[in-house]
A protein has these predicted regions:
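Substrate-binding/catalytic cleft of secreted carbohydrate-active enzymes
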Residues: 1-138, 149
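Long, highly charged low-complexity segments enriched in Glu/Asp and Lys/Arg with interspersed Ser/Thr
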Residues: 146-153
Length: 155
């Protein structure tokens, strides 16, 4: 994943494929794409997403979003909370999430986007960019807006 160490990505991809040819392989999740595996994987925060077309591999935005909100009393460590883009309220976070999907994700579905992974499902330790809080007690985005916008992600 990213800069955690990408050594011989194509060689490792071939090795994994030799062990199990039925699994989908993302050989360079969000890092230097060498054209291997089944997925052209992009991690994109804040900046616009530009679709890359390929006849051989699925284009997947394997990390995007990172929108953050601190919910007092439901955070692992409020003093060290990190997020790519911080919002002060559930309402402002909901509005930004909807705008992100409306402007960046939904328009490229019909153009070849195969999948997305929003960062992230829940807060983890110092990262407060989850849809749910660290303790999974609070949904940080309005449930009805979340259902409505996410229902548009189906092809």
């Amino acid at each position: 994943n990213e800069a955690w160490g990408q050594f011989d990505a194509l060689k490792v991809c071939d090795f994994v494929r030799s062990l199990d040819s039925h699994r989908v392989i993302d050989h360079a999740s969000g890092w230097y794409d060498q054209g291997g595996g089944d997925i052209d994987s992009m991690h994109k925060y804040i900046l616009p997403i530009h679709l890359r077309k390929s006849k051989k591999r699925a284009f997947v935005v394997t990390e995007f979003g990172g929108y953050s909100n601190i919910v007092r009393g439901h955070t692992w460590n409020e003093k060290k909370a990190f997020g790519y883009l911080m919002f002060k309220s559930k309402e402002s976070l909901t509005k930004a999430y909807k705008k992100l999907l409306d402007k960046q994700i939904i328009p490229i579905i019909d153009k070849g986007l195969s999948g997305t992974v929003y960062t992230q499902v829940s807060d983890v330790e110092n990262e407060v960019n989850g849809i749910y809080t660290y303790d999974r007690a609070v949904l940080k985005i309005d449930e009805n807006v979340l259902k409505d916008i996410n229902s548009q992600l189906r092809y």
